[in-house]
Swiss-Prot record:
Encoding gene per record: tsf
Protein name: Elongation factor Ts
HAMAP family cross-referenced by the UniProt entry: EF_Ts (MF_00050)
Superkingdom, natural source: Bacteria
Xref: SUPFAM superfamilies: Elongation factor Ts (EF-Ts), dimerisation domain, UBA-like
Amino acid sequence: MAVITAAMVGELRALTDAPMMECKKALTEADGDPVKAEEILRVKLGSKASKAATRVTAEGVVAAYVSGNVGALIEVNCETDFVTKNDDFLGFANTLVKLVAEKNPADVAALSALPLEGKTVEETRAALIGRIGENMSIRRFVRFETTGKLASYLHGTRIGVMVDFEGADEQVGKDVAMHIAAMKPVALSSDNVPADLIAKERSVAELKAAESNKPADIVAKMIEGSVQKYLKEVSLLNQSFVKNDKQTVEQMLKEAKSTVKSFTMFVVGEGIEKKQDDFAAEVAAQVAAAKQA
């Protein structure tokens, strides 16, 4: 049986907002596995127990660039929030996103090899690290080239959205991009939701329904109802439009004679686990070192 520490409980609580005792029970049941513990909390406490998708820990910025029918999004990471406000770091990210749009590199390695003001991008990055004194990396980027229109939205520098759409009204694209940043859909329509996410949601629904002790036919309906509710919540076209919750995004687009072809959203640090410093251990080590000196 794994030893459940206060730090483990605190970390799970930070991810889920669940009560401390529930977090400890879930970790005990999961034998210390935080991923399993989070799933257990979802079954016990409902979907509000999982906020991992919107709670990110790594630092950095998202930059966007649109020129006519070509555009790009990029995420550049650093170690601390302080550096995200540095003009040189921000300038580097904005230069890179324009370079992605103009040169269409295949991947981060190809982007890093491109020339930039007499150096390569990689050499420029290394020089910036030396100047600022903090590690930084190019995490990911996406490039758009469309026969329609592009709209981008940046929520500060932490969330970036690019939308490929068709329609006469430019504002529609901007509104959809802002909606995506706020509501964070995972797919354009329910048909596009990744199978692994549906399977995970169905598994949670099955466990919750099994605890109801209802007849099998009722349980089956409960499971299907939960899955359909999830699909509606995470697919863009089915979501209630953030600027008018009386209609869905699909209804708004139809009314505006517009269509969304695709979209991409980057959230800084999404999926990256940031090292947590153990300050108590650090102080203890410093005290021990001082005694030996």
